[in-house]
Structure formats: structure tokens, C-alpha cells
Amino acid sequence: MFSRRSHGDVKKSTQKVLDPKKDVLTRLKHLRALLDNVDASDLKQFFETNYSQIYFIFYENFITLENSLKLKGNNKSQREELDSILFLFEKILQFLPERIFFRWHYQSIGSTLKKLLHTGNSIKIRCEGIRLFLLWLQALQTNCAEEQVLIFACLVPGFPAVLSSRGPCTLETLINPSPSVVDAKIYPEEITPLLPAVSGEKIAEDQTCFFLQILLKYMVIQAASLEWKNKENQDTGFKFLFTLFRKYYLPHLFPSFTKLTNIYKPVLEIPHLRPKPLYVTVTRDNETIYSTKIPYMAARVVFIKWIVTFFLEKKYLTATQNTKNGVDVLPKIIQTVGGGAIQEKVPELDGAGATEQDKSHSNSSTLSDRRLSNSSLCSIEEEHRTVYEMVQRILLSTRGYVNFVNEVFRQAFLLPSCEISITRKVVQVYRKWILQNKPVFMEEPDKKDVAEEDADKLGLSETDSKEVSSESSGHKRSSSWGRTYSFTSAMSRGCVTEEDNTNVKAGAQAMLQVFLTNAANVFLLEPCVEVPMLLREQVDACKAVLIIFRRMIMELTMNQKTWEQMLQILLRITEAVMQKPKDKLVQDSFARSLAGLLFRTLIVAWIRANLCVYISRELWDDFLRVLSSLTEWEELITEWSNIMDSLTAVLARTVYGVEMTNLPLDKLSEQKEKKQRGKGCVLEPQKGTAVGRSFSLSWRSHPDVTEPMRFRSATTSGAPGVEKARNTVRQKATEVEEFQQAESTAAADCDYLVVGQQPVPRSSSTSDITERLYSDSSQGQKVENSQNLSSSEPKSVQESKGHVTHEHEGVTILVRRSSSPAELDLKEESQQTHGRCRERQKSESTGSDMAVGYSNEAELPVSPWQTCEEDPELSTPTDAVADSDARHWLQLSPTDASNLTESRECLADDCSIIAGGNLTGWHPDSAAVLWRRVLGILGDVNNIQSPKIHAKVFSYLYELWYKLAKIRDNLAISLDNQSSPSPPLLIPPLRMFASWLFKATTLPNEYKEGKLQAYKLICAMMTRRQDVLPNSDFLVHFYLVMHLGLTSEDQDVLNTIIKNCSPRFFSLGLPGFSMLVGDFITAAARVLSTDMLAAPRSEALTLLGSLVCFPNTYQEIPLLQSVPEVSDVVTGAEDVKHYLINILLKNATEEPNECARCIAICSLGVWICEELAQCASHPQVKDAINVIGVTLKFPNKIVAQVACDVLQLLVSYWEKLQMFETALPRKMAEILVATIAFLLPSAEYSSVETDKKFIVSLLLCLLDWCMALPVSALLHPVSTAVIEELHPSRAPLLDYIYRVLHCCVCGSSTYTQQSHYTLTLADLSSTDYDPFLPLANVRNSEPVQYHSSADLGNLLTVEEEKKRRSVELIPLTARMVMAHLVNHLGHYPLSGGPAVLHSLVSENHDNAHVEGTELSSEVFRSPNLQLFVFNDSTLISYLQTPAEGPAGGTSGGSLSDVRVIVRDISGKYSWDGKVLYGPLEGRLAPSGRNPSFQISGWHHHTCGPQSNLFHGEEGDDVLDKLLENIGHTSPECLLPSQLNLNEPSPTPSAMNCDQEKEIIEVILRQSTQEDEYVQRCHSNSAVKVTSQGQPSPVEPRGPFYFCRLLLDDLGMNSWDRRKNFHLLKKNSKLLRELKNLDSRQCRETHKIAVFYIAEGQEDKCSILANERGSQAYEDFVAGLGWEVDLSTHCGFMGGLQRNGSTGQTAPYYATSTVEVIFHVSTRMPSDSDDSLTKKLRHLGNDEVHIVWSEHSRDYRRGIIPTAFGDVSIIIYPMKNHMFFITITKKPEVPFFGPLFDGAIVSGKLLPSLICATCINASRAVKCLIPLYQSFYEERALYLEAIIQNHREVMTFEDFAAQVFSPSPSYSLSGTD
């Protein structure tokens, strides 16, 4: 009927509207056309001009339609007509508010609205009636009557009847009042439903909530629809309605609404715990819904949500969003009733809308979409934005409204768990106000306004209280609609009194205090643990509140009152939530969900508060009381430990100037420095970025901290500005970090906490810290300060003393006052230090870092916590939290930063707020005090009831102590490694936990785990170098604790102490430490006697091994514990030694752990050396040697190798062994021989490489013993019962040595007959030696990682690898040993000293045919030289050299000498020979030299008979003298009778006298017969021959004659030698090969670096610059070897130069098999940078370093930067002239001995043991090199290559020709 088509002729339509002749329906049609086509301003003028006719048109049409509906019922056309009529009615109300205000058509409009509001109408008509009624009521305002107010009070069904003058009223009674006079003739017209509801119409289940939503929504959106001429009336219209709402509805919605909520004068009473309500369950749509029986709870939620809508970001919808698929969607009012309103849950006000519904069975009018779109309950149209903003402005316009809103929000915090979702909405509002956009009432008031403010004005809260307390309204209602009730009366009754309170600025602090107090109610509601869903809801709400708390802590500036309120609230919350009930079931789940977050928030808030304001002692006491009562919560311990980590990082930075994330020791290697220099300034911004992103990693590590997505506001979740803000945070964090680093440098000058070695007087301004920290102790013991408080200190400081009194009841750090005074007293800077600090701070205050950092810091738009909440996906490992965490939640707030800058600049002598001063933020005193207080905030940790929690605390204490120790290690570290800084003035309190630890050891056994942690920390604490020596009281307590622990029956306690108390404890030399030696021995023995696999067996044996030298040093060591199986207490040094060695002997044979067995064997070796060096002649030395000897045949080759190394060590003590027992050195060799013979059969066929290598080690050890023992010992017959029985001749030891060597070369089955008997283990059996001593097995370690074939292929070719593997290791080694013995036994060392082993003579020396001084090809053309190959293994050069003539005369003939140069696997040797038998006439004159000895350097053994060998008298028996001389020069050639060869042999023992006579007779008879025969021949002329004359001798002239003669004498020219004797091809390649072979070493070589570190040296420059050391150091270096002159040294140089650039001398040690050169730093010049560089190059390139350190701190490997140094042996001199040894090695280096890590040795043993250990360490390192070869293996390969490539194969004739004439270019005579 009424279409929306355009009417072009507006004027025509106007005329028709105003034409009274037209029917009212036609006029309505044209009026509707005008409404659609005319602007609102023109319409208002039109309506005001023609108001009467317009109302007539409306009313007539309305009455007509009403009658039609009553008669005909409703249909679609009538509903459309009703829509049009009501639309006109709405426009009348909108355009004519001024007339309506004066009650224009008052009764008619009222009657019409009653018809629409009739409860019998359909829901849609009733909603439309409410909307139009609110328009009318807003227009009437003060001219409304009581009936209109009562109708408003009854619009929402479900509330109690409103009391009036006629009694209780409802909407029904108000629409159709009952007649007051029963017999009256005239009655008011009965109002009936206009459009009754039909059956099937969907009705909201909770009509109260539904109509309340309608009412609240229309109160807002209709507030601005009236076209007032005075626009201000729009505000008054809403205020009028809202006042009525608060009067009639609010008391029912909020029965506990109070006037006390006043942010202008807040009442901050902390709430109490509320019991949980009774929850009822309703199941709807398969979903369980929980509610309470609290009246009007759902309506209360609706109202709170409505209020929240004005303060949260709203979702405005445009007109296009209200259509779907191009078709108009159903009106929102229909959608709401049909869909959303039937739900129990109230829909979100900022949601996206509800679903469509079916249009059937609906009596609702099809109102136009333009009007219906205003009725949405789920979203806010764009056109309503202004009206919502207007209402928001109104709600914040006066103090009364502000207090009202905050009280409503307080009521939201009181909601039960089932409705707590709206509480989270309120939390979002507060979050927006506090953290983002502050409302006007949070702005700071003007000072003038504050001064003039009337304290009595309490705003709306007071008037509301009057309403609540007044009589029940007392309305006197009349039947007429007179002006008996007006807006003026409402004002006089206190409904609206806000106008006088328009100054709403209260300041942020008051608002924060009110929020803190109200928000606590969320936590203080008893949780419903029976319903998990409700529990989760409450937990989520609590976390949302805590998020704001945390952001406030981090980002806001709060005054003291606000801080105190926050701390009290957090304490109350924590105490209420975390206090476990007696049944331990009710609150556990709720408390557990909040525990970590709540504890962390509380502690962080406490720390931040103390940095910003003064916190009273009473609050600290409450803090201590609450947390110490909650120690059963594991979460508390976790958060406390995390906070302590962060505080420790701050303490390190502010007090000690150390950054825990950038420690000096972590960046000292030169490689890292180069990388940093290469990256330049990129590092700092990157670090800042990382810090900015991970603000508080320990909070971020908890997933329950992150705010859920549904809590986020629309402005921050995904907003474009957020990422930009985060980048700003990162940038500013970098700048702040840079400033803080500079600040910490300045603060380092003013550090305090624990004194170092030099006392510095305290200043009066900070000495109060000492008083407060140590004012009381737990036992009531008063701690006295070394300095009294100054009388001039500020009063505030004096009043604030003793904040932590009760804290120390738990932390009993002091045993008594005298306990370690230097450590427990606080140290403060002097006034002079203050002055320096002030100057430095002033200079820094003008720097760019501080100016930029702090000026920009205040601009941070997004806090770190917000970053966490917004970005939960950004996760960072929790192990990196320490300092980055502290850098954020412990940094100053932005506004505090500038204040700090000023205070630091102007008040440098002041102290922190916590110390009574004015400085905020982190300073040395605040950091130390807070660290100390938070440490003790748990109370006495030994009072914790839970053993698990107790153990966790002590476990963390160990971690905390480790951090403090790390800080100490990083103090006074040279950053550039160029100079050593002075010792630190302040050191961390490493013994601070002592009293806790001591007490923990006395706890019952149920606290065992904590006790073990305490023992572990005690050991770590007392095995560390003590900067300040503990006093006697402390030591007595410590020794008592250790004694009780070491004698404990608990095996775990023993294991813990032994594992963690290293031998360093003995090296510290604490007073009285020796009293624990016996306890340690006993405890270690008990640990070793157990079968526990986890027992610290290696540590126990290390302890025992470190004590082997103590009994000789400390002559009487008491044993405080009786020895098992001995009733008396053992005392005295000898008994202790016996006790100790018996344990070592037992474990050296029975220990199952491989490493421990090795340590036990090494310990025995050290003890043997100690006893031999001290000449103690202890009887158990033999037992120790027996164990070591038996271990040689142990299946585990690692253990056996250690035993072999020990035997090799004893080589240098053979003389001491001989003094101990004459046969003992020979016994060593016999053991080796028998062991080799025992192991050889299995080893030579074994596929395991270690078996073969061990045989090689035994062979080399045997060689060392053979070379060390005198020849007489080796020639001594082996005397054993078995051998004497089988072999009466008793072969010498050397014979058995050669036999076993021959077995190694030829195979173990070589000697199987009795005549070739080899020494066996059974032959060694005697009373002193048991070769079959039983040995227990050990658990093998991880197998050695062999190099793969691919790795080998990368190093050598396949052919070379095959060649290397073709060399048989055992036979080759045995051949080398035999060659070595043949050449050197009895000769080494030569006259040139031990440095010369092989010959230095070559073929060109003394060669008349060669002019060059070096070996060259000219040598091969010499006629007097020939080169041969013998047995395909040896190169032999024969050279004929001219002999010198007799002195002072000429010789009859010039005889030549023969020189034989031999090159084999053992080395190069030279022998000179002379003609022994020749013509008498050509006998040479006495020679004044012995060229063979002088040239080759052999030692010349002079013997008496030898000198007269060729110069006896005529007729002397020269042969007789020769035979006699052989007995002197070569005793091994003598017969077993030891008679000279020229002496008659004694009579054989088996021959008697008769037999002897018979033999003599036979011989004489034969002699007589021979003489007779000769006589007969002489007499017979037939047998006579012609006599020949003696030929005259001819002098040989051939250059190779005598060489050829020698070859003939040696049988080399015989046929049987022909296959083993060959010539070499003489060419340039051979020459190069020979030179290369001669350059190879003939001994094992090692180069060892030696460093000297003096006291206070911690940089390489200082260490390398040392030119001399202490006397003990010089004595040690002298004991390492012989000091050799490098310019003339002939042995191994190790890279040192002869020109003096690397020093003039160096220690050198050598045997016939090993050479060691020591690169001693103090021997090398350091006068220039080049010298230092060269020195470092030589020292750093060595694999093994010896470090002699006299510094008070442990040596760090990084001080000497080198990629080598695989093994470092550090020597620390002790006070008792003993030396503590630590060995650090790379993990891949295998075990080596004889010294081990932790050994303690005496000065006599030190050089030899260090030297032996260095050699073994060098061998261990070299064995890791792929395809590493020993010197003889290398020589064997070279020899093999020479022989294969240069051996010349020829016929015998050619061979003889070459031997006859080596060089055919020379013509030789036939007689040569």
C-alpha cells in the first residue's frame, strides 16, 4: 500500500496532506511520501507549522486501524498499515518535543502508548511501544506525571511491583487500573491488546533480561533522535531516563551497591574471602549451563555488560553489512527475539549479529529496515556512533557518574564464577584505561582545584545511599495525570545531583588504588573445584587481572601509597589463594593454576616497589611471614629461584661490573675477538633486538601467563601500530642497555657487599645498610658492626633500619660474629670513592648514550609484558633468561629514568631509597640489599616440611653459588689479554650459605636428598681457593660437619662427599686440615668396598692417590676413625701409610672401574717413587711392584699400558731400587721378558691393534731397562729354581732378552726345545713376587674410534696405506731393539754426551777423493767407496781412509783404515778398522789418535792391556795378549767360568783323577808318536823338498784394497752370502734418499712448553714477559733435564734456533730412546714484540704445556691463546713444599700417567714425575694422529723404499768387479 516510490511533486503532496476534504488514509499516504523525500530540517518546520492536522491524521488512522483489527483480525495489509501509522507517530514524537514537553495531547499519546505496551501484545509490538514510550518520556522530562514514571519502572517484567500512592503497581494495573469506585457509572476505556500474540510465537525464556536489554539499548539510541531546538536537551533526556533507571531498577540489580566507592576519597579496605554460591545446572542443547539462585543475577550481568559497552572499542556496522545476498535481512528486533534472546547467555553487545528465524507465526509488523536497523541488540550501527559517544561522555562527566561506573565495575568483580566472563570484560576496560587511553578522571587534577575542593562533597554515592535508606518511595499517586511528580522533585529527592561535581580529575594513583582493591575480589571468591569449567573461567579472569598488575608494575609510575596497596593486595591474594586447607583438596587445583604466576608477580612487585619507594619494615615482615608459610608450594621455589637468578645478574652488573650474559671469560679467545672485530657494531643492535623481544623470559616460559585471544582488545590484537611499537621497544632497549653498561662501569667504583683483601672504610651514608642487613640473627645473636652509625645520618634512615629482622630468623648465615668477618661484613666506599664516582657520573650524564637512552625511553608505547601477551608464539628457551630477564622487569620505569639522571648528577653522595636515601633504581646498595632480602624471604629453608621442596631449594642454592663463583672467576679479568688488572676490591660472598648448609646436615634422614645437596655445596665451597681465610670458629664447625659426614653410616653421604671433595681441599692447606686425612682415607675405602655402580670410585682413588706423599711429609697424622677390624684408633704416620697403601694395593687388583684402576696403579707408582726418593725402604714396595708387574698381563690393555708406563717411570729410579734390594732392577727386566713371552703367542695372531701396540710398549720398556742397567746386571745369570733344575749352566739375563726378541722377530714358536728355553712367568715365582696374583676384571670403557677408510684415503694413497700395513709392528720393533742393544749397550752415552746417539760421519768425511763438505754426487765417483745392501734391511758403506803417519818420522809403508758406515732401522753408526795382522816390516808406528772413536764420537773405554797390544817386546806371545784383552773389552765373550781366554780352563767337574791321567797319557803318547814320525821324515831324503825363500812383502796400493780385505775376512764374498749382499745404484735419487734418511730422527722426540705465572698475572703479555721465576720454579726446571747451550747442542732442538733468538739455553732430557726439549718461557727473550710473538709461536705450538702457577687464582687455558695445547699440566706450589697437580686435556686424549688430575707430590719427585707424565701425554696426543708412525717405523719405510728402488741386481762376476774396483775410471794394477 505504501511503497517507497519517489514523489516528485512535494508541493502537491503537501497540499493533499493539508486538504481537509481528503480522507485521512489518503492524507496519510501523502504524508508518508513527504517523510521519505523531505529533509529533516524542513520536516521539523512542517510539523511545527501543521502539528494539529498531522496529529489528527495519525490519530484518526490509528483509531480506524484499531477498530479494524478488533473486528477483522490482523493480516499482512493491516500490519503494513500499522507500520506506516507508527512510523508517523515516531516522527511526531521526534519533531515536536517542545510541544510534548508542555503536555500537548498528553492523554491521547499516553493512551496510545498504553495500547502498544499492553502485555497481551506480541513481543514486537511491545518492543516498539517501549521505544516510542522512551521517546515520549524523554520529551516530557520534568513535566511527566507519576504514572509515566511508574510505567517506566514497570517496563521490564520480573521485578517486584513498584510501590506507589495506590499501593504496589505493575504494568497491567497501570494500563488498566481497577476502578476506585465500584458503583461508578462512567469507567475509563478498557485498553486491550492491539496486536495479540499468536500461539507458536517464540518468546525469550528470560523475559526480564530480554526487556532489560531492550530498555537499555533504546535508552541510548533514542536519546539523540528527538529534534530539539536546544541540542543540550538531548543530554538531559538520557540523564532523566538513566536517573529513573538507577532509582527503580538498580536496587534490585545490585543489592550491595555502596557509596564507599569513591575514587576521589578512596576507601581501600582489603576485601575478605567470599564463600562460593550454590550453583544449579541446566542442560540446554546438549550443553550444560551453570547458574546461581541469586535473584536478578542474569539481569545484573546484562546491565554490567551494557555499561562496559561504552568503554570498550565497539564494532560499528555500516548499512551494507545489514544485507545478505542483496536481500534485506529480517529486522534486528525479530532476529533477536527469534534467535539470540532465547539463549540463557546474554549475547555480546559487540558481536556480529544473530541468526535469521522463520517468519511464520509472527504478529510482528514489517517495519521498514531503516527504522528496524536501529533496534539491533548485537551490534552498533554506524549512525549510532555519536549517541554512544555522547552517553560515554555523560558517564564520565561528573564525579557521581565516575564513582557510579567504578562501583558497577566493583560489582562485576563480585560476580560468581558462572558469570565471570563479564568480569573479564570489565578487566579489559580497566586495562584500556590504565595501560592505553587514560580517561579524563585519571588525569592529574590541577593544584588549584585540589586546594579548593570541598571534602564533604561525595557526589552521587551519597544521594544513592539516601535513596536506598529512604522509605519506599512514598509516591502519592492520583488517578489523574497531573504534575504531582516532576523532574524537579526528582532532583530534590537526590536523583540527579551531578552538576556541581563536573571537575572529575582524580589522578591516576587513586584510580589504580581503587582498581587494585576491587580486582582482588576475583581472587577472593572460593573456587568451585567440583566444576572444571567454572574453575577455568575463574582462573582465566584471575590471570587477566594479574596481567594488568604486571603491566602496572613494569610500566606505570606509582606513588608510595599505590605501591603499598598493591603489595598488600598481592599479599592478601597470595595468602588467601595459596593457603592450603586442612583437607588439602579444595583449593589445590585453583591455587596450582595460579601459583607460578602469582608468586612471580608478588616477588617482582616487591622488588620494583623497593626500587621506587620506601617500603616499611612491617610490610617486609608480612612478606616474609606469608612466603615462609607457603614453602610447601613447589611453584614458589621455582619462581623464587628464577627471581634470584635475575637478581644475581643485576648484582653482578651493578656491584661487580660483570654482565652474566657477556662474561669476560666467554670472549677471551682471539678467534672470537676477530669475529667481533669483523662484525663491527652490528652486535649491539642485534643484542638489543633480542633483548627487546624477550623481555621477561622466565615469565614467558609459562604458557598460562599468555592472555587468551578472546581477552584481547580490538585496538591491540593485530593492529598495524603494534609491530611498529615493538620495533621501537627493541630500539630503545638497545639504547637503554648501552647506557646501563656505561652506568655499571661507573658503579663498579662504588661497589660493595663483601670486602676483598684491602679494607676500605665505609661512609656514613651507607653504613646503615650493614646495620639493617645484620641487625638480628636467628639465634638472637647480635651482629656487631665494625663501624658505628654516624649521628648525623638522616632521621628517615634511622627510622627505616632493620627491614629484614624476621628474614634473618630463617637465614642463619653466621655461626657467630667472629665467623669469617671479612666475608660477612659489608664494605662501602669511602668519601674519596664517592667523589670519584660523582665526577664520573657527571661526565657520563652529558654523554650521548644516556641522553638518547633515557630521553627516548619514556616514549615506549608497548611494554615488554604486552609484547608477551600479544605474541605468545614468540618463544625463547628458558636457559637464556638470566640477564635479559633482569634487564626488563628489573629496569627503571620510564618516568623514573629522568629522575635518576638528575639524582645521579646532583646527589651522587646519596644512597638508594631502600637505604634511606633518594636514589631510585638499581645501585650497588639496592641491588645487594634486595638480593640478600629476597634470598632469605623463604625464612629458614631448613624449616621446610616437604623433603622434596627442601631438596629443590638446596639444589638451587648450589646453582646460585655456582653463579656467584662464576662472578668471582670473572672479576679482574684482562679483557685485552695485554695486562693484568689489580685484584678486585669486592668479591662475592661464597661462604654465605654456610650456616644453612651446616644445619641441613643435621636434619633427619627423610631430608636425605637435601642433605646430599648441602654436602655437595659444602664440598664445592671449601675446595675452592679461599680469597679470605676462614677463621678458626668456622673451620671447627666445618671440620665437625665433615667428620660426621665422612664417618656416616649412610653410603649416599659418603658417595656425595667423596665425589665432590676433590684433592684440592688438601692443597689449600687450611689450618688443621690434616685431622681429616684419616677420615677421608676411611671414607674412600668404604666407597671402594661397595658394589654400587654409581659409587664415585675414580674420585675415591684420586683422593687416596693424592695422599700417598703425606705420611712422609706429616710425620704424625691422626686417624679420628678406628680402622675396620681393629679395635684401637690408629695413630702415627707409619700406620696411616700402611693403611693407605693396603687400600691402594687392594683396589689396584680388584677395582672394577677402568679409570679408577688406572688411578690406583698410578698412585702406587707415585708412592714407590716417593719411598725410593725418601729412602724409606718400606716393605710394601715389593708388593706394589708385584701388583704392577702382574697387571702387565691384564686383558684390559688400557690398564696394562698404565702399568707399563709405571715400570718405565721406575727406570730412572733403578739405582734406588738397587739400593733397596740388589736384585730388584734385574727383576724388573725379568718380569718384562716373561710377560712378553706370555703375551706374544696371542698378540702376534690377534686382529686387535691394541694387543700388538701393547707388546711394542713392553719391548720399548724392556729396552729402556736394558740400557739403564749396567752390563754386569744383564750378564748376571738368571737364578730360579726351575731354571737351575732344567739348565744347570744358567744363561745370563741378556741371553733371555735376545731369545724373546728373536721370538718376536721369528715367531713365538721358534724356541720349543729345552736348549732354547725362554723365561716364563712361573720362573719369576719367589717369596717376594707372585706372578699369578689374581686380578679382578674391569668394565671396559668405550671402544676406541678408529679412522674409517675414507679418512685414510684423504691422507695417503691406497698404495702407501697398504705399505704401512704390510710392516709387521712387533717384529719390526724387536729388530730395532736388537739393533739398538747391539750398537749402544755398554756404549751409551758416548763421549759427546747423551745428545749424540747416532753417528754424524758421512761418506764424504776423511775422503781424499772428495773435496765438498756435504754429501754430494762426487762421493759416488770415489774409488775408495762402495755401498751395499745387507739382508735387505741395512745399508752398509765401506770407505777406505788414509791412516796418519807416525809422529816425528816416516813410516815404512802407509797403511789405510777401513770405515764402515751402517744405516738400519735403529739409526746410523760408524766403525773404523785397522789391520790386526800384517808384515812385521810394515808395522805401523804408535798412533796419536783413534780416528774411529774421534770421528764417530763413541765413548772410548780404556783398558790396561789394550795399550800394549802391538808394542810388546820381541818374542812376546801376541795371541796370548789378544786373548787376554778380549776378556777385558768384551766380557760377554768369556766362558761361564769367567776365566780369561788365555788361561787354562778348570777341570771339568765330572772328571776324576784317573781319567785325567789316562787322557794325559794318551796325549803324551800321541805327541811322542808324532815326534818320531817327524824324525823319520827328516832322515828320509825321499820326502825332502826344496826350500823356498820368504817372499818380500809388497805395500798394497789399491784405494779399496783394505775394504776388500775386510769383506773377505767377513765372508761377504762367499757364495752363501751372495743372496743377502748386494750393491746399490749410485745416482742422484739415491743421494737424496740417503740425505733424507740421515735427517730422520733416531729417537722418539717430544717438545714441551713450560710457563711461569707469578702472583697477579692473568694475561699473556705479563706471563710471557717473565724472565725469571721463583727459586722453587728454577729448581724444578733444573730438575727436568740438563741445561744445554743451544748454539752447540747436537740433539733435538724442537724448533729452537742456534742464533739466540729463542734463548741461549734450554732444558734437555734424553735417553737412548727418547729426546725431550723444553720450551721454557723464562729462557726465551722477551725484549721486543717480535720476541714475544716468536716466543708465543714456539710455546703455543706445543701439544703439552707445563704451567707453574704461583697466582692466587686457577690457571685458565684461554690466557695463552693457542689451537694446540691438547694437554696442560698445571703445578700449584703448596705451603708445605708439596705441589698440587691438575691435568686438563681434550676429551679425545686417552688416559695417561703416572701423574693424574688431582695428584699431590713432594718436591723431590716433581721433576721426574712431570717429565714422565709429559712424555706419556705427548705419546697419547700423537696416537690420535691418523697413521702416526714411530721413528723406527718411519726409518724402516725409508730403508725399504731405498732398497727396492736402488738395489742393483747383477751377476757374481759384475759384483766381484765392482767390489774390486768401485770406480772403473781409475786404472788399477793387478797386484792391488
From Swiss-Prot:
This is Ral GTPase-activating protein subunit alpha-2. Residues 446-481, 711-730, 758-849 are annotated as: Disordered. Highly expressed in lung, liver, testis and thymus with lower levels in brain and heart (at protein level). The keyword Metal-binding does not apply. Keywords: Cytoplasm, GTPase activation, Phosphoprotein. Residues 1634-1842 form the Rap-GAP domain. The modification Phosphoserine is found at S373, S376, S379, S486, S696, S819, S820, S1592. The lineage of its organism: Eukaryota, Metazoa, Chordata, Craniata, Vertebrata. GO terms for biological process: activation of GTPase activity; Ral protein signal transduction; regulation of exocyst localization; regulation of protein localization; regulation of small GTPase mediated signal transduction. Residues 446-469, 796-810, 824-843 have a biased composition (Basic and acidic residues).
